[in-house]
Regions:
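Positively charged, aromatic-accented nucleic-acid-binding surfaces
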Residues: 1-36, 63-107
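Short, charged/polar low-complexity linear motifs in solvent-exposed/disordered segments
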Residues: 50-51, 99
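DNA major-groove recognition helix of helix-turn-helix
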Residues: 45, 49
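Short Lys/Arg-enriched helix C-cap and helix-to-coil transition segments
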Residues: 53-67
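Key DNA-contact positions within bacterial/archaeal DNA-binding proteins
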Residues: 39-43
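Residues at alpha-helix termini
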Residues: 34, 51-52
């Protein structure tokens, strides 16, 4: 599976890949991106599912890792929903970058 991730550089700039259809991020990548701990991220994911914003079959995928374990991967719509659900400086930076790239594409 080819996938892209949203990254932050050492200066706090967010890099969003142009191929948004292949953006899938795992829990640790989201924890680092938003600057939260794993239980906070899991609670936000549960809250998004509880509000019935997304069906888990649409926003989540489980892939098998080379070591035999499985990892949950979250699609771009879930990443966007989490960015607006979580209240941290990392999430605010992601929100601003997403809105900026959205407005830039319309022009």
């Amino acid at each position: 599976m080819k996938r892209e991730i949203i990254t932050t550089d050492s200066y706090g700039r967010i890099t969003i890949p142009s191929d948004t259809g292949n953006i899938w991020m795992n829990e640790m990548e989201l924890v680092e991106l938003f600057g939260v701990i794993a239980p906070t991220l899991r609670a936000a994911i549960r809250a998004v599912y509880k509000c019935r914003v997304f069906n888990p079959l649409e926003a989540e995928k489980r892939i098998k890792l080379p070591n035999g374990y499985y990892a949950d991967m979250y699609a771009l719509p879930m990443v966007v929903a989490l960015a607006f659900r979580i209240d941290t400086s990392g999430a605010a930076t992601v929100r601003n970058a997403l809105l900026e790239s959205l407005c830039r594409r319309k022009e």
